[in-house]
């Protein structure tokens, strides 16, 4: 499969009058090419006890280790579904696992943030409450809010700096190799 740079992805699919294709498209077209291994699960949405959109598992049958990544996409920001909000931010004492990373594509940046750091920020800024209705989403977290917290951090990657993106994925790939 042909590899595409982030700036090309943004030009063809994000900076358009058409509807943005969404996170599953972003995973398939751009993110999968960044990993040295094929994920064990894509977009499991909580099925089989897996959290996140991209999941790598240990090949050792006696190990339950996994590395999971939640992916979000949105021009100005993004929100979380009812289940994601309730399980990951409100009922944090549950035995369900949490993602290891958040990868978020916004208008101007790609954010690759360790989940714990992102989760702490989201809870601090949005003070999420349990969503009781059948449908509903969390409050939106905006690009500018992420920038204010991570302005000088390596979590925020300028779209034009593909080499910085590679450095972040090298780190994640090393973690995947250790599974």
How does the language model describe each region?
Residues 1-179:
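Nucleic-acid endonuclease domains
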């Amino acid at each position: 499969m042909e590899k595409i740079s982030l700036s090309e992805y943004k030009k063809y699919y994000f900076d358009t009058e058409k509807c943005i294709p969404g996170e599953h498209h972003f995973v398939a077209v751009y993110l999968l090419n960044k990993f040295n291994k094929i994920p064990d699960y894509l977009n499991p949405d909580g099925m089989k006890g897996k959290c996140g959109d991209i999941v790598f598992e240990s090949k050792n049958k006696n190990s339950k280790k996994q590395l999971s990544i939640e992916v979000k996409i949105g021009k100005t920001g993004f929100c979380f579904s009812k289940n994601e909000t309730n399980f990951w931010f409100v009922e944090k004492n549950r035995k369900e696992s949490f993602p290891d990373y958040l990868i978020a594509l916004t208008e101007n940046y790609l954010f690759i943030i360790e989940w714990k750091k992102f989760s702490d920020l989201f809870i601090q800024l949005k003070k999420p409450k349990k969503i009781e209705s059948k449908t509903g989403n969390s409050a939106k977290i905006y690009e500018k809010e992420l920038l204010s917290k991570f302005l000088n951090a390596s979590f925020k990657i300028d779209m034009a700096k593909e080499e910085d993106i590679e450095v972040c994925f090298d780190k994640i790939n090393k973690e995947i190799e250790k599974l």
